[in-house]
UniProtKB/Swiss-Prot annotation:
Stated name of the protein: Phosphatidylinositol 3,4,5-trisphosphate 5-phosphatase 2
Cell location: Cytoplasm, Cytosol; Cytoplasm, Cytoskeleton; Membrane; Cell projection, Filopodium
Record organism: Rattus norvegicus (Rat)
Entry text on domains: The SH2 domain interacts with tyrosine phosphorylated forms of proteins such as SHC1 or FCGR2A. It also mediates the interaction with p130Cas/BCAR1.
Biased composition (Basic and acidic residues): 119-132, 952-966
Disordered, as annotated region: 119-181, 897-986, 1004-1115
Broad class of where this protein is predominantly found: cytoplasm
Length: 1257
């Protein structure tokens, strides 16, 4: 029995049939969930080990904890439970024998194995495959030259001898023999295979036997044809095909049924390539031999690309009202961009029809500053004289024109850059379900991103991209023919001979990657893979293909998939995705502990995902006719599943502004053909966005989606081709000018502490593994030195600095380290299995003081907890030199005053993704989160929310770090010298948004010394939860354009996974493992002890230490990032009884009514819209003068301190504040256990406090 994962088959260990307690490919988290639902001591199951191929894991529930034992095979295929040193090993031939022994008491396990836990199996109906896994009915294909179809020889006239194996009536040679075989299989053996699949089998032995018997004659015939074609090929090509030779030699070797089928498929593939290429070889050979044949024109190996013509843009100068009065009317300019010449010409038309023009070379254009509020406004900083700059703000015709102008200037900068290697490249992604029909001759609109949605401007469509990636499904064209078609189309379009990097196929699912000739030598470590997701992951027409490679120092991954079809098959599509995520073998083999979503700097996932719309067909058609897509996006299955964290955890997708791409009437884009005749009856296929492009990038990297749409003129298929173009930052293969690091100038990565909250019912110890390309080898920590849990489903584990290694990067240059990332995996000591993985960017960790990070853990595509810590990257002072990247040249200006403002808030383009670490300010800690929602902004007419504002570089606004050439200055004002501080290169905050502080409590570490002061410590800023769908502000908010808005707004870095509307958030000062839950109320109505609200603090009273004040700030912060409580809610339906005086953490779903409403896929929950930001600033200004830092109610720390002094218990004030009870308004809900945690141990004092609070109610 073959294993899907490629691991040794457990068939021998399991016997003839898999028992009910064995679960193939079950994840650790799912196993714990099954055991938690069983709920009885002695419940057990066996699953495949995640850490050792061919091994098993025995999971046992005892006292609500899951204990895991590894079952390892030895050299003689005997099985044994891994034991401690000195304990005798017991060997077993099968798992059944092993389970039988340990079902008896006192055999060394934590308890006897009493109750086997079976999996939740949902048998498919017999006609299920007809409904979802069979290709759609297609019209007959027209005859083509080089056809890949092959007839099966049958009938008594065949010269081949009959096979010697016994024949059955199903295999008789009749004109319809294969149909008879299919009929016999469905009548008899189908049920046996179905039972085998239910029992955990990964293959279909009876179907395999039937297919082998039916295709045996085809084997012989194909061998004959291949032999003849090989001889013919030798005549013309003078060389034989090694693949054909090897296939013919393997024919004499004994093969199993599955091997025969695989061999047949491979032969047919080779035969297809032979048939498509034999005519070209013959023609070339005959032309060479014929003296009368005209010589073929010599083609250069690399043709020069078409030159980009000079492009002109009509703009108006943006001036103040006073300047407009002086001038008389707005000035009109023409901006001419000469990419080839490296010049920008400003042409001004004057009243007397004279023209005044000024030319700026590329090196005198210092910075472009995009206005965020006015989408068609752009500031350009010019160099007038040495160290003097001038900024001019221009208003373009539309936001799309502004984006085209920026792209041309970036291309000009890149073309004339003195750098040997590029900082940024453009990537084209295309996906198309071709419907098993050959493509039309002209697919230029797909290649050039023309059509519906967010398309490129006509000025930039002809600019060639650096990398083209084409993913197709139901592509009946041969691999070589398809590749030639793509290269020919690109050559005709760009005059460049693009180089194929990789081509991978699985059935009719194909992915092809082509790059510019100049980049061919920058590509390395190419890898390809495929995964089948059909019946039992072995047969069917669905699956995925993938390609990965390194572009200099940046890793790329591309996955093209075709998932299960059918409106009702959402769960199966989700499982398809998880199978691909786990089984696709791409990227660095040393990162096998991580799934492919964490192996690459940039991962693009696209294809026919087949997620549909859950809405009545007539409603869908009405919305489409009115071009109202927002209501449809709310019921899009992919959006809903991502919101539930089921698939594509923390992936991003650009805003969808084009109509559904499926299912059109072939030959037209005016009509959706939503009726389909199936063998089981008429099916309804509602119009849907089946074809999608998503991506996931490491934090603190640069990626912008410039277009996302579909064509409207390619009509051969019932799907429309979809395109997306991306601007991606890349790194070079860094070579230090100072050579390798010596001991004296070595860089160090040092950890002060790490804390993880892991979703598990296990109570084992854990360790952390650290991986990075900047390390010579991976490193391990010691086991954690502290752990605690107040909830059975979660475990808090902590490591102090003693348990954490000091990492030594291979290079110490900051320019190298700021592009590096650290991969972490939290593994258990008992089974060495991963409980969660994450990635941390080093850029924000560089400095002499420790910075804090916070991110989420995931495993097998599921969120499994979060991790936070304190670390620093120490870089020698002589290696601090760095340079500006090309993508840092364009900035975002949140301030609409433009050049009139002395210090506008500017965000560098390179800092699109920021880490969760930055220095807090007094303003940040003082703004209550509730203010964000006091004045909800009205939605735009289309129903789409405005995009969240970009982060503002706080460091730049307080202490500008821009270089002189990048700092917008007023004319005639000398730029100040640049200020560099590499203590933390990226402190970025959102103006007016309260920032949640989540520092590590020093007292939470058993062995970590409490620092004497927190003056220089940086509190963690928790990233706001958001669904990774990028939104651009709608035109109309300060813009006069009728066209698409241009700028793409990337998310903040460490983008947390999207939370559903029902998500519950924990305050950082409350332990997520012990937080009480209010029953019987909705979240919005709950009046239990919410987190104490932040408010302005009074001056430090005498004797108060900065550390205690910092803890008070922490206790008052509001944290909306952690979804641990939500994970606890969904982990299991078991409602464990709480301890005395404590509410249960897991509420009954029937009792906790969660608010539901229309999902907002674009706006992070904690990002205020622009107008709300202004009100926040006003509110902060009003709140600041409040006496004693209190609120209008007069309740606060001062009131609580006075109350404690009045009853003679002021000694407990510090402990209560430290635990978050700093407000009398919420102190009335404190429990006896909460008092104990705050340090109130005296029973008399506890009773006095509680009685006094009761009387004050």
């Amino acid at each position: 029995m073959a294993s899907v994962c490629g691991a040794p088959s457990p068939g021998g260990a399991l016997g003839s049939q898999a028992p009910a307690w064995y679960h193939r490919d079950l994840s650790r988290a799912a196993a714990e969930e099954l055991l938690a639902r069983a709920g009885r001591d002695g419940s057990f199951l066996v699953r495949d080990s995640e850490s050792v191929a061919g091994a098993f894991a025995l999971c046992v529930l005892y006292q609500k904890h899951v204990h895991t034992y590894r079952i390892l095979p030895d050299g003689e295929d005997f099985l044994a439970v891994q034991t401690s040193q000195g304990v005798p090993v017991r060997r077993f031939q099968t798992l059944g024998e092993l389970i039988g022994l340990y079902a008896q008491p006192n055999q060394g396990l934590v308890c006897a194995l009493l109750l086997p836990v079976e999996g939740e199996r949902e048998p498919d109906p017999p006609d299920d495959r007809d409904a979802s896994d069979v290709e759609d009915e297609k019209p007959p294909l027209p005859p083509r030259s080089g056809s890949t179809s092959i007839s099966v020889p049958a009938g008594p006239s065949s010269p081949l001898p009959a096979p010697e194996t016994p024949t059955t009536p199903a295999a008789e040679s009749t004109p319809n023999g294969l149909s008879t075989v299919s009929h016999e299989y469905l009548k008899g053996s189908y049920g046996l295979d179905l039972e085998a699949v239910r029992g955990g089998a990964s293959n279909l032995p009876h179907l395999t036997r039937t297919l082998v018997t039916s295709c045996r004659r085809l084997h012989s015939e194909v061998d004959k044809v291949l032999s003849g074609l090989e001889i013919l090929s030798k005549v013309f090509d003078q060389q034989s095909s090694p693949m054909v030779t090897r296939l013919l030699q393997q024919q004499s070797l004994p093969q199993t049924g599955e091997q025969e089928l695989e061999s047949l498929v491979l032969k047919l593939s080779v035969l297809k390539d032979f048939l498509s290429g034999i005519q070209k070889k013959a023609l070339k050979a005959l032309q060479d031999m014929s003296s009368t044949a005209p010589p073929a024109p010599l083609q250069p190996s690399i043709r020069k690309a078409k030159t980009i013509p000079v492009q002109a843009f009509e703009v108006k100068l943006d001036v103040t009202l006073g300047d407009l009065t002086k001038i008389g009317k707005s000035q009109k300019f023409t901006l001419s961009v000469d990419v080839e010449g490296g010049r920008l010409v400003l042409l001004r038309r004057q009243r007397d029809s004279q023209e005044d023009w000024t030319t700026f070379t590329h090196d005198r254009i210092r910075q472009l500053i995009k206005s965020q509020r006015v989408q068609n406004k752009l500031g350009v900083v010019f160099e007038k004289e040495k160290d003097r700059t001038q900024r001019k703000d221009f208003i373009f015709v539309s936001a799309r024109k502004r984006e085209a102008f920026c792209q041309l200037l970036q291309l000009m900068k890149n073309k004339h850059s003195k750098q040997d290697e590029p900082d940024m490249i453009s990537v084209f992604i295309g996906t198309w379900n071709m419907g098993s029909v050959p493509p039309p001759k002209n697919v230029t609109s797909w290649f050039t991103s023309k059509g519906l949605g967010k398309a490129l401007d006509e000025v930039t469509v002809t600019i060639p991209h650096d990398i083209y990636v084409f993913g197709t499904q139901e592509n009946s064209v041969g691999d070589r023919e398809w590749l030639d078609l793509l290269r020919g189309g690109l050559k005709e379009l760009t005059d460049l001979d693009y180089r194929p990097i990789a081509m991978q196929s699985l059935w009719n699912i194909k992915v092809a990657v082509l790059v510019k000739p100049e980049h061919e030598n920058r590509i390395s470590h190419v890898s390809t893979s495929s995964v089948k997701t059909g019946i039992a992951n072995t047969l069917g027409n669905k699956g995925a293909v993938g390609v990965s490679f390194m572009f200099n120092g940046t890793s790329f991954g591309f996955v093209n998939c075709h998932l299960t079809s059918g409106n009702e098959k959402t769960t199966r599509r989700n499982q398809n995705y998880l199978d691909i995520l786990r089984l696709l073998s791409l990227g660095d083999r040393q990162l096998s502990a991580f799934d492919i979503s964490l192996r690459f700097t940039h991962l693009f996932w696209f294809g026919d995902l087949n997620y549909r719309l859950d809405m009545d067909i007539q409603e869908i058609l009405n919305y489409i006719s009115r071009r109202e897509f927002e209501p449809l996006l709310r019921v899009d299955q992919l959006n809903l599943e991502r919101e539930k964290h089921k698939v594509f955890l923390r992936f991003s997708e650009e805003e969808i502004s084009f109509p559904p791409t499926y299912r059109y009437e072939r030959g037209s884009r005016d009509t959706y053909a939503w009726h389909k005749q199936k063998p089981t009856g008429v099916r309804t296929n509602v119009p849907s966005w089946c074809d999608r492009i998503l991506w996931k990038s490491y934090p603190e990297t640069h990626i912008i989606c410039n277009s996302y749409g579909c064509t409207d003129d390619i009509v051969t298929s019932d799907h429309s081709p979809v395109f997306g173009t991306f601007e991606v930052g890349v790194t070079s293969q860094f070579i230090s000018k100072k050579g390798l690091s010596k001991t004296s100038d070595q860089a160090y990565i040092e950890f002060e502490s790490i804390e993880a909250i892991v979703k598990t019912a296990s109570r084992t110890k854990f360790f952390i593994e650290f991986y990075s390309t900047c390390l010579e080898e991976y490193k391990k920590s010691f086991e954690n030195d502290a752990q605690s849990s107040d909830n059975i489903n979660f475990l808090k584990v902590q490591w102090s600095s003693r348990q954490l290694p000091t990492l030594k990067p291979i290079l110490a240059d900051i320019e190298y380290l700021q592009d590096q990332h650290l991969l972490l995996t939290v593994k258990s000591m008992d089974g060495y299995e991963s409980y969660g993985e994450c990635v941390v960017a080093l850029k924000s960790m560089i400095g002499s003081t420790a910075q804090q990070f916070l991110t989420f853990l995931s495993h097998r595509g599921e969120e499994t907890g979060n991790i936070r810590g304190s670390m620093k990257v120490r870089v020698p002072t002589e290696r601090l030199g760095t340079r500006e990247r090309l993508y840092e040249w364009i900035s975002i200006d949140k301030d609409d005053t433009g050049a009139k403002s002395k210090a506008p808030s500017v965000l560098r383009g390179s800092q699109e993704h920021r880490s969760g670490s930055r220095k807090p300010t007094s303003t940040e800690a003082s703004c209550p989160l509730s203010k964000l929602f006091e004045e909800p902004e009205k939605p735009p007419p289309t129903g789409r929310p405005p995009a969240p504002p970009r982060a503002v570089p706080r460091e730049e606004s307080l202490n500008p770090r821009l270089k002189s050439e990048g700092t917008p200055e007023q004319e005639g004002v000398a730029a100040p010298p640049p200020k560099n501080s590499f203590n933390n290169p990226a402190y970025y905050v959102l103006e007016g948004v309260p920032h949640q502080l989540l520092p590590l409590e020093p007292t939470s570490f058993a062995r970590a010394p409490i620092p004497p002061t927190t003056k220089n410590k940086v509190a963690i800023t928790v990233p706001a939860p958001q669904l990774g769908r990028h939104r651009t502000p709608r035109v109309g908010e300060g813009s006069s354009s009728d066209e698409d808005s241009g700028g793409t707004l990337p998310p903040p870095d460490f983008p947390p996974p999207p939370l559903p509307d029902s998500a519950i958030f924990l305050p950082p000062n409350l332990d997520p493992l012990s937080m009480p839950v209010v029953r019987g109320r909705s979240v919005g109505e709950a009046r239990g002890p919410p987190p104490p609200k932040a408010h302005p603090r009074p001056p430090l009273p005498p004797g108060t230490s900065p550390a205690s004040t910092f803890l008070e700030e922490v206790a008052s912060a509001d944290d909306r990032s952690c979804s641990v409580l939500q994970m606890a809610k969904t982990l299991s339906e078991v409602d464990y009884s709480p301890g005395p005086g404590r509410s249960a953490l897991l509420p009954n779903p029937l009792e906790l009514q969660l608010p539901r409403g229309p999902s907002d896929y674009g706006r992070p929950l904690s990002f205020p819209p622009p107008r709300i930001r202004e009100s926040i600033q006003e509110d902060l200004a009003e709140e600041a003068p409040c006496p004693q830092g209190g609120r209008a109610s007069g309740l606060g720390e001062a009131g609580m301190g006075a109350w404690l002094r009045a009853i003679g218990l002021e000694r407990y004030e510090e402990g209560l504040v430290h635990n978050g009870w700093d407000d009398l308004e919420f102190l009335s809900d404190i429990t006896e256990e909460d008092l104990e945690e705050a340090g109130v141990q005296d029973p008399a004092h506890k009773r006095l406090l509680l009685d006094t609070l009761q009387l004050s109610k």
